[in-house]
Amino acid sequence: EPVELRYTSDHWEHGDVAYTGTWGCRAVPGGQCGNTLYVWDITVRTAPVLTDSIQVDARVVNDVKVRADGTLAIITHESSNDGLNGITLLDLTDPLQPTVITRFAAPDLSPGVHNVWIEGDYAYLVVDGAVPSSGLRVLDISDPANPLIVASFYGGGSFLHDVYVRDGLAFLSHWTTGLIILDVGNGVAGGSPTSPVEVSRIAVPGYDVHNAWYWPEAGYVFLGDEIAVPGRVLVIDVNDLSAPTQAASFTLAGAAPHNFWVDEDAGIAYFSWYENGIHAVDVSGRLLGELDKQARQVASIQYDVGGACIAPSGTCSWAPQLHDGLIYVSDLNSGLWVLQPTF
């Protein structure tokens, strides 16, 4: 059923469990098949076993995140039948059999929640739309049964697509508006989760910022654009957080990138590149210029050869995640894959 009925969206691994979202119907386009979270036992890392599923009122469960302590998960809702989009908070006391704590569907979230990031007692929600009432919402989840919106931010110009929070900084992938950096507790600009303060922003002409990864030790932010072909990942130098600058890029023909994961200890970035599969790139050292012309790609794989993206078959990589030395990949067409790096 996970493969035959529903397309697969994002995923998250924690401990011995993997969670995968869904992105609509394979057989009946427009139906409410993207309403399911699947739960997988990955105790045997190379042989995931489906143990449970949770259904919500949504046509798309685009994102799933697990809090670092493993006690709570959040899934996002878009296109609900009742028009009350938002999120569902899950109790992971038994991680293989999650239970619903509450569905949170405040009017502020009615356009739909596309992505989420959990940081301690706060959840950062990406609300669909390119109007001031959309953008970022910060949710206090210290009492998960009674979430409370405590802050909002809209960067103007275009819609917010994703948020990544680390070291008290929120990195907003704000499409044509660019990358926006907020202080949400770092101290660099006096911000907090309940009162975010903009630190800086950078826009790249012709580039739609889809997602970001901040690597603090290296002083870089990696940006993706899922629209333009040939696809390009940009590297932004943020050693001076108040003045980000473009440092490098990595380009591939034929498709656009989607999500990615950086193994910071090894200096390897794993880029999910839709029908082009997964590409592992050496991002160690100083990054300048066109990385694709510097022999930095160390491996790539199209694990489902043939077919096309969003089709009955064929590689259509959504997102990689490094977990216990393996690369877990969600694929729109074919579900969850487990890859072993061999370099």
Spans of model-derived segments:
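Feature marking well-ordered beta-strand scaffolds used for ligand recognition
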Residues: 1-343
